[in-house]
Amino acid sequence: MIKIYNTMSRTKETFKPLVDHKVSMYVCGPTVYNYIHIGNARSIIAFDTIRRYFEYRGFEVKFVSNFTDVDDKMINSAREQGITVPELADRYIGAFKEDVQAVNVEPATLNPRATENIDDIIAFIADLMDKGFAYAVDGDVYYRARKFSKYGALSHQNIDELEQGASQHVDDEETARKEDPIDFALWKAAKGDEIAWKAPWGTGRPGWHIECSVMSTKYLGDTFDIHGGGEDLQFPHHENEIAQSEAKTGKQFARYWMHNGFVTVGDDNEKMSKSLGNFVTVHDLVQKINPQVLRFLMSTTQYRRPIQYTQASLQDAKNNLEKLQNAFINLNYRLQGAQGAADATVAEQAAQLETDFITAMDDDFNAQNGITVVYEFARLINVYSEKTAVNAEQINQLLTSYAKMAAVFGIELKQIENDDAEIDELVKQRDQARADRDFETSDRLRNQLKEMGVILEDTPQGTRWRKKDE
């Protein structure tokens, strides 16, 4: 039984979907004014891993993640680059799709864009105004936060404390326009030549919070299973989404709230962010390292915990990934001539590890415990691959189970095709030299292969080879 830590209740709760064997998920997507950085990728990969585990457990997942393609950052960036906001959005949505594909993120069921849902946003705001939850001031529209009795419930904050904080962070001009300092914008009146749309209360554009309320309920329904995002979105973004959505529908918005931890950098574990200038983009990093290494680092840490991004953590991820890949390759190699009987003990151990994996991941998607089980499975198949007699059917069963568990973390385990005839010939020459006890020639050929980036592994069944970093 899957248990989820619900930010709303601050407890682990047994997951009970609205519809049996189906999961509806909404995860806040990027504002597409630049390349995503590794901190953004943490959330994307964390929720992709959660989605993959639901699928591993037999659930059908409808996964919606939006693109914020109009806001202040979009407008400012487009102006700086001398292009339109839609052109900027198209550019970085394309870049986003390339980046997430590189780190093996499954495509969302839907990636709605805010600008494609303007009519729905206007209708949503009008409904809130009709219900008395929103008011217009000179073309702007604000939400009456105090009218929503549960405001602050998600972030566990008192509304009076929120009022005090709001009064310290809002400029005097905007404060004067609002009925209450904690009220927030649903619609912003157009300024100059900014991109804008016509609405009954004036030409302008939507606020950030209303976009997610509209797109999540439009594509998943008034109530859906899971809403996710980074922990920095709890307040005000997710708090405001709840206030908007539940005021409009009169129903519970999301049933489970999930928030991932930050990526930190430096000795003081500072949060990685564009505003602090301490970020590394996925676009740049995947050109320097195997993207699977970044995926491994991000997906094998429990999603609520922070990840410290260092060269050492990347190297550890690289080493562990190679161990898992090599275990797969070694066992796959034994398929040739595998005619022995199946090993009942190995089958029992494999079945137990599959059970252990489910136990680990059912506990709030505990990836650290889950990947530990995958390491244990790798050790099991390494031992089995060294047996004198192995069984082909059992090898395939082990490889299938192993690959399915690894795939939950977005790790692709597969046989690497070594079809280089020149290398094959050099390996054969070395094997013959070893058989002839011509160690000088054997060592010379090993060094030659090493210079070619080839790693050799001598086994009782023969010499296996692979190219470095594959």
From Swiss-Prot:
GO biological process terms held by the UniProt record: cysteinyl-tRNA aminoacylation
Can the keyword Ubl conjugation be found in this entry's annotation?
Answer: no
In short, the EC number is: 6.1.1.16
Note on how the cofactor is bound: Binds 1 zinc ion per subunit.
Q: Which GO terms describe its molecular function?
A: ATP binding; cysteine-tRNA ligase activity; zinc ion binding
Q: Which reaction does it catalyse?
A: tRNA(Cys) + L-cysteine + ATP = L-cysteinyl-tRNA(Cys) + AMP + diphosphate
The residues listed in the UniProt record as binding Zn(2+), with positions renumbered to this chain, are: 28, 212, 237, 241
Task: Give a single Pfam family match.
Answer: tRNA-synt_1e
Keyword field contains Cytoplasm: yes
Gene Ontology cellular component list: cytosol
Subcellular localization, as worded in the UniProt entry: Cytoplasm
Residues bound to ATP? 274
Q: Which UniProt keywords apply?
A: Aminoacyl-tRNA synthetase, ATP-binding, Cytoplasm, Ligase, Metal-binding, Nucleotide-binding, Protein biosynthesis, Zinc
Required cofactors, per record?
A: Zn(2+)
Q: Which SUPFAM superfamilies match?
A: Anticodon-binding domain of a subclass of class I aminoacyl-tRNA synthetases, Nucleotidylyl transferase
Where is the motif ('HIGH' region)? 30-40
Q: Which domain of life is it from?
A: Bacteria
Extract the InterPro entries matched here: Cys-tRNA-ligase (IPR015803), Cys-tRNA-synt_Ia_DALR (IPR015273), Cys-tRNA/MSH_ligase (IPR024909), CysS_C (IPR056411), Rossmann-like_a/b/a_fold (IPR014729), tRNA-synt_1_cat_dom (IPR032678), tRNAsynth_Ia_anticodon-bd (IPR009080)
Family classification: Belongs to the class-I aminoacyl-tRNA synthetase family.
Subunit: Monomer.
Q: Quote the protein name from its UniProt record.
A: Cysteine--tRNA ligase
Upper classification of the organism: Bacteria, Bacillati, Bacillota, Bacilli, Lactobacillales
